[in-house]
Amino acid sequence: MRSASTEQPSSERPVRRTPPTGVARTTPLTALSRVPWADIQDSTGSAAAIPLLLNGIAWGDAETARSALEDLRKRICQYGFVVEQATAATVPFLWELAQLPHVSCRPQIIQLLKAIADARQWECTAAAYPKLLNRRENPVVWERAARQAVRARRGDLGRLMAEQDTEIARATSELARALSD
């Protein structure tokens, strides 16, 4: 005759051996810790909050992701055309998020990448005021680095253009046009 177990039921979650459906097999944003966020600047000062915002986009519900992306946009591409020191470091993570099926605001991420690719505010200002180029913190260099970071991943455009979601495909087509210049 068997006796009933005297062990208490566990309140711990079981260890999940496979990722949830629709989630990439590799964890997104694993390289975030390699960037010295506290040592670089966004529009608010220290860029230390950027990893939290990127994680909010990656793992938050639709409203959380949308809010995090809007806050991130204000920090790295203020007004839709003024890039910051942290912008170039953030771009590879935006490309990564734009390709993850579970991320709810992918078209808006692609639109942000296009805004960064189009950014020429600091270059235009420096053309009129060359002294801007003599500053220790040179925003023209940031702007060029950010545009180059977007261009560096243009090989990912084909995969995004093949998406069934028409909003993603349209945003990707606009980004592709911006990168073809």
Give the ranges of each region predicted by the language model.
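HEAT-repeat alpha-solenoid elements in large eukaryotic scaffold proteins
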Residues: 22-32, 62-75, 113, 125-134
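N-terminal "cap/leader" segments of large eukaryotic alpha-helical scaffolds
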Residues: 2-65
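Flexible loop/turn segments at the boundaries of HEAT repeats in alpha-solenoid HEAT proteins
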Residues: 38-43, 79-87, 120-128, 139-147
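Eukaryote-biased recognition of C-terminal alpha-helical segments
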Residues: 132-146, 151-181
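Conserved hydrophobic register position within alpha-solenoid helical repeats
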Residues: 68-72, 109, 113, 143, ...
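Alpha-helical solenoid scaffolds in eukaryotic proteins
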Residues: 47-56, 88-97, 152-159
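Alpha-solenoid helical repeat architecture
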Residues: 57-61, 98-102, 161-162
